[in-house]
Regions:
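Adenine nucleotide-associated cytosolic modules
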Residues: 1-327
């Protein structure tokens, strides 16, 4: 499993930690329990934290057990439908009774209660706030204000905590978080204000370049936002097996698919959006922008002029460009 290209990047990350991670050579053999509290799982944020968390966890560990409260049968069915097709290292095991909790190497819980006597990380979210605790501090159980941004952040922080446990990261290199509450709205620690609700409608005219690892996460969020309008996705590549470990939307059946077209298909599940994928490099796309794109059904008479300044193409201002890099 250590040599499996599908896990090569988590393995490389663990290796780079060196002596700071005692189990860097064994973490893929370990076992994770995913569970939750009924009250939090019943919220929109709780559901999102669970599904986001599972999408991420299966990229770093092939041995996952899911055990949810019996009242969560519908959510369990959703896990089977949305998550099972994405697995590639091993099938997720679903149990009514998880057994001895101390036998798990890490426990990822969607809830509010901390359990410091176990390898337990609890997460939830409220609006723009992401919460996580791997120590003795309980979290607020107020999770009613739905926002996929806060939910994905909470799940991501929680999965990072799980990874620390799997590799047995020494505290001198990275301590476990205890009762963190972080606002994605104003970037404050200890946040209690969930900040504004998302609007009911977000009009966009967006050029989206790069639908790989980071792009996959952004597409996941965009697909759950109340967007209307048009999105162009540009990426010249297809998914390879090495992308399974970093792209939270894809499973084995998606290897070989064009990244841009795949992203557009996800976005088009929102009937208020029109998205189109272009499997080409940005310079090729921009070189024919003013020629061929006018003929696409996607474009209307007001869209192209509004997009041009944002692209920063043909000498037009670049002040609207945004770049995100993993390096």
């Amino acid at each position: 499993m250590q040599d499996d290209i599908r896990f090569s990047r988590p393995v490389a990350t663990a290796e780079r930690l060196g002596k700071h991670a005692d189990d860097r050579h064994r973490f893929l053999e370990k076992r994770i329990l995913v569970t939750g509290e009924r009250e939090v799982l019943a919220t929109k944020n709780g559901r999102a934290c669970l599904l986001f968390g599972l999408r991420l966890l299966l990229r770093i560990c092939p041995n996952i057990v899911v055990s949810l409260p019996k009242e969560c049968a519908i959510l369990l069915d959703e896990c089977h439908a949305a998550i099972d097709p994405l697995t590639f290292g091993g099938d997720i095991i679903y149990l009514d009774n998880p057994g001895n909790l101390a036998e798990y190497d890490a426990i990822f819980c969607i809830g509010a209660t901390a359990r410091p006597g176990l390898p337990w990380t609890v997460v939830n979210s409220q609006g723009w706030i992401a919460r996580v605790s791997s120590g003795s501090t309980h979290l607020s159980a107020d999770c009613q204000l739905g926002n996929p941004i806060g939910a994905l952040a909470a799940a991501s922080l929680g999965v990072a905590e799980v990874f620390k446990r799997l590799v047995r990261l020494r505290a001198s290199r990275g301590q476990l978080l205890d009762g963190l509450s972080f606002s994605l709205y104003d970037y404050t620690v200890g946040a209690t204000d969930p900040s504004p609700s998302l609007p009911e409608r977000l009009p966009v005219q967006l050029l989206f370049v790069g639908a790989g690892a980071i792009g996959n996460g952004v597409v996941q969020l965009l697909s759950q936002m109340p967007l209307t309008g048009h999105i162009w996705v540009v990426d010249s590549q297809r998914f390879g097996p090495e992308n399974l470990e970093t792209c939270l939307l894809i499973g084995p059946e998606d290897v070989g698919k064009e990244k841009a077209v795949f992203a557009a298909d996800i976005l088009n599940l929102n009937a208020s959006l029109e998205a189109r994928g272009f499997t080409e490099k940005l310079d090729v796309f921009s070189g024919r922008l003013g020629k061929e794109l006018l003929s696409f059904d996607l474009i209307n008479g007001t869209f192209l002029p509004g997009l041009m300044p944002r692209l920063g193409l043909r000498g037009v201002s670049r002040r609207f460009l945004i770049k995100v890099s993993a390096s």
